[in-house]
Amino acid sequence: TKAVIIADGGFEGIFNGTGIGFGMDLALQSGIPLRDMEFISKTPFGVTNSKLTLSSNMLGYGANLCDTSGNTITAENFVQLCDVTAQSSGAVIDGRDMGDDKVWWQSAFRTVKSSTGVDMNKYTVGLENRVNQTLGGIATDECGRAVIGSWSRWFTGLYAAGDAACSGLNGAGALPGNRLLDALSGGSSSGNHASEWVKDQSFSNTDNLLASLE
């Protein structure tokens, strides 16, 4: 192998049973330290009694976030929204009055109905706060290279991207939409650098490989 790009998910599965961070574990067992593991991102749009998470963009298309009494829940930013919903007696999302924009969300509606039995065209859906993204991981530089030591020495041949990487793009808290941006930019940087770097490199452990074939 000339180069390896670790580009799997984070470890939010510790909290919600989805991604469990195999790539990070592989790096850690290879002696590569992980960075900023204390930083996580929460969402108030986790569908209760399921592993589903709805997009906050639904609010911009006419859906309403309410408490169990029907009062609209508002906040100045996403972090505050998480705090407000956590302090309320319960939260629901109402997608019944989204008008013509509802057609764009029918896939999400069908997924919710398949998982919970609730038809969002007719009923509200209960929500809960949950961890949906972890921000720590394999420290990378601007080229997507895994860095160690004082975060300045490359672990030669290793790259990371996506939720497995800690690029610094998100800081201590991710904004909605930046997860995709981080994955795209990290994947592009690591892929481009790796493809150029391997042109002048030899395969590692070639002698051992050839010896095993004799």
Predicted segments with their positions:
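Short, intrinsically disordered, charge-balanced linker/junction segments flanking boundaries
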Residues: 1-5, 9-15, 69-76, 211-214
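Glycine-rich loop(s) and the adjacent beta-strand/alpha-helix scaffold that form part
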Residues: 3-52, 176-193
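Long, amphipathic alpha-helical stalk/connector segments used for oligomerization, subunit docking
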Residues: 197-214
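Secondary-structure transition/capping motifs at alpha-helix termini
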Residues: 28-35, 145-147, 152-154, 196-202
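Mobile, glycine/GP-rich and aromatic-enriched active-site lid/loop segments adjacent to catalytic centers
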Residues: 1, 38-174
